[in-house]
UniProtKB/Swiss-Prot annotation:
Protein name: Rhizopuspepsin
Enzyme superclass (EC): hydrolase
Domain of life: Eukaryota
Chemical reaction(s) catalysed: Hydrolysis of proteins with broad specificity similar to that of pepsin A, preferring hydrophobic residues at P1 and P1'. Clots milk and activates trypsinogen. Does not cleave 4-Gln-|-His-5, but does cleave 10-His-|-Leu-11 and 12-Val-|-Glu-13 in B chain of insulin
EC number per UniProt: 3.4.23.21
Taxonomic path: Eukaryota, Fungi, Fungi incertae sedis, Mucoromycota, Mucoromycotina
Family of the protein in this entry: Belongs to the peptidase A1 family.
Key words, A-Z: Aspartyl protease, Hydrolase, Protease
Amino acid sequence: AGVGTVP
């Protein structure tokens, strides 16, 4: 989840 993150 989020920007530039997993997930």
